[in-house]
Amino acid sequence: KCMGTWIDISQRLDDNVAVWPGDTPFSYKVNWSKEECGSVNVGQINMSIHTGTHIDAPFHFDDDGKRVIDLDIELYMGNARVIHLPNKTSIGVDELSSIDLQGVTRLLIRTDAWKDRSVFPQTIPHIQPELAAYLSELGVRLIGLDLPSVDPLDSKELSAHHELADHGIHILEGLVLDDIGPGNYELAALPLPLVEADGSPVRAVLKKLH
């Protein structure tokens, strides 16, 4: 059973949101104003897909990988487990082996490693590639983090991205889990129906479960 109300775990999108160094900064502007045309305000958004809270499609790191429109939409809705792993330099089997994850399909990891989301971090606790096989065997199909990537920020190989995809695990990044306690929740974090895209912004929300 669900308890209480939905909790927004998405980054707010405005000029203060951090972007990958060299990537497109977020901007919103009104192209047609009600004052000028007498009817409506019509805005335009310009942003990188990998800004704020977003999902990665395999095409992001694999030219032959699935695009957003090809992803199983049900993976982004349903029961999720939130766990806390603060003060880690990386996250692997050793960090998770003492946590019971049987029956968990969607795993959200709160690291508390990215405090000021108006500034892109210098380093993050990345996912160790061998964790993918371990999580897959447990039945995990979606991993979410309060970080901009699952790999080291200077990685060119993106080994964790590839291993997760090879084991059927989808990636959700940039969550805001600061006030979320460990436990079981209902998650909704739906990507847009982007036909050619390598990722999508999402509005991620949680509701506590009994």
Located regions from the model:
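Active-/binding-site microenvironments in catalytic and ligand-binding cores
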Residues: K1-H210
